[in-house]
């Protein structure tokens, strides 16, 4: 559509112009239904959306939204997230949250010092140890931890999806007191002084 708009004055035939405008209109409608209405671009493309539940049970801020997941029972996932919200909300220390659930900072009305939008190993969402920018990323993570005086790192994901053993290598000269809170889905890792 933008290319057509830029070149519209160069098109001499009214028939070609009308054809192109109609074609752009129908293509726009087709893609709207496919990608916006049917959500073909998301991981929930093949999920039965009839299993969706009201997301408002997580927070009033999610009123009018539905929750559906490709991983597990939506109710089970909501329970884990609710428990995480409760624990993270009560913890007044400065923290980092490593998760795909980016909306938690909005629900908690708190800066959770999110490092990435998402974490998918082997999918180039962030540099892993074999990536040429790993040391640059690691330095950035450690500078953020120091600058923001982070005391604890929380991890919230699907079961065994984001494991601390995969994340730990980003933290230089740090020791942790770790606890798995909920079935390898939710854990915390308190930064402690290393014993010499």
Regions found by a protein language model. Give the residues of each.
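Signature aromatic-anchored transmembrane alpha helix within multi-pass, membrane-resident enzymes
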Residues: 1-42
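Residues at the C-termini of beta-strands that transition into short coil/loop
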Residues: 20-23, 116-119, 182
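Short periplasmic/luminal acceptor-recognition loop of GT-C membrane glycosyltransferases, typified by
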Residues: 33-38, 49-122, 151-160
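Short, flexible/disordered intra-domain loops and linkers
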Residues: 72, 124-133, 160-166
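Well-ordered, non-membrane alpha-helical segments in soluble/globular domains
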Residues: 77-84, 133-140, 163-164
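Short amphipathic alpha-helical segments and helix-helix/interface helices
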Residues: 85-88, 141-142, 168
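Extended hydrophobic/aromatic segments used for targeting, binding, or gating
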Residues: 108, 112-150
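Aromatic/acidic, Gly/Pro-rich catalytic loop(s) in extracytoplasmic/lumenal soluble domains
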Residues: 148-196
